[in-house]
């Protein structure tokens, strides 16, 4: 019910399977959306965007957690088959609508739920709190995550043969790196993953430094390398710096550096 909804996003926050998600749409995105989409002005005050909370009826497990947590009773459970026309709306939003400038901060319940979940539609039980926590972590850190999974429920829904509920960000194409050790040593296993990642990164930096400090290196490459090193321990700042360095290294490689 878009009139009753206060847009707190708590329903998406508790969803075990990432099947209910909020979106903010621009004017062009609204025009391109299916005609049956339910929209509302943003709250607590209107903005240039329209708000919608969309559900994937084919993936919803019917646990009712969203109804339980909703503070204003804006969600109603109805038979799945009656909501078939909502699936194209959800699919359109997932494929075409992303975060916008000026959205609530990622470190808030409301703001975090506008981030793409990188854990979705898993085989965990309906209402499983474990996947709710794991999904939230991927929304905050998923593009930079290394997961050393302990053997248990999370290894069953997290890594079933031939499928994976973990995915990649649709823009960056990056997502969690997942592995599971059967020997009840995931702490040691995870430490090994971290050490290995650090060694590989140090080797990559050393190789980039050779190119960036050579006589053939351009001023742009040197600046990009310096920025990368300066921000290497700041994930948010280092992400664009890494992309810029890779672009300059590719140019240098093409020029024979």
Regions found by a protein language model. Give the residues of each.
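Short secondary-structure boundary segments
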Residues: 16-28, 32, 87-102
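A general structural signal for short secondary-structure junctions and capping/turn motifs
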Residues: 11-14, 43-46, 67-69, 136-141, ...
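Ferredoxin-like iron-sulfur electron-transfer modules
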Residues: 1-7, 24-62, 80-85, 111-122, ...
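Structural motif
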Residues: 52, 75, 144-148
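Cofactor-binding active-site loop characterized by glycine-rich and histidine/acidic residues
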Residues: 92-257
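Extended amphipathic secondary-structure runs
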Residues: 54, 60-62, 67-68, 136, ...
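Iron-sulfur cluster-binding cysteine motifs and their immediate structural context
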Residues: 10-29, 56, 65-83, 132
């Amino acid at each position: 019910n878009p009139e009753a909804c206060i847009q707190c996003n708590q329903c998406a926050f508790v969803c075990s399977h990432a099947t209910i998600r909020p979106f903010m749409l621009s004017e062009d995105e609204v025009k391109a959306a299916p005609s049956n989409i339910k929209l509302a002005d943003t709250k607590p005050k209107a903005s240039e965007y329209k708000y919608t909370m969309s559900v994937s009826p084919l993936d919803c497990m019917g646990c009712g957690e969203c109804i339980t947590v909703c503070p204003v009773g804006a969600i109603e459970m109805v038979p799945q088959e009656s909501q078939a026309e909502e699936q194209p709306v959800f699919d359109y939003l997932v494929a075409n609508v992303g975060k916008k400038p000026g959205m609530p901060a990622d470190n808030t319940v409301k703001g975090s739920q506008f981030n793409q979940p990188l854990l979705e539609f898993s085989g965990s039980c309906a209402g499983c709190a474990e996947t709710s926590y794991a999904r939230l972590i991927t929304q905050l850190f998923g593009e930079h995550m290394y997961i050393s999974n302990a053997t248990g429920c999370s290894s069953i829904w997290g890594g079933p043969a031939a499928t994976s509920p973990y995915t990649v960000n649709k823009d960056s194409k990056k997502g969690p790196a997942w592995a599971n050790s059967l020997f009840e040593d995931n702490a040691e296993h995870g430490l090994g993953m971290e050490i290995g990642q650090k060694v590989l990164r140090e080797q990559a930096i050393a190789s980039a430094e050779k190119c960036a400090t050579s006589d053939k290196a351009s001023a742009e490459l040197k600046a990009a390398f310096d920025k990368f090193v300066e921000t290497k321990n700041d994930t948010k700042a280092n992400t664009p710096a890494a992309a810029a360095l890779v672009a300059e290294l590719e140019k240098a490689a093409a020029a024979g550096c």
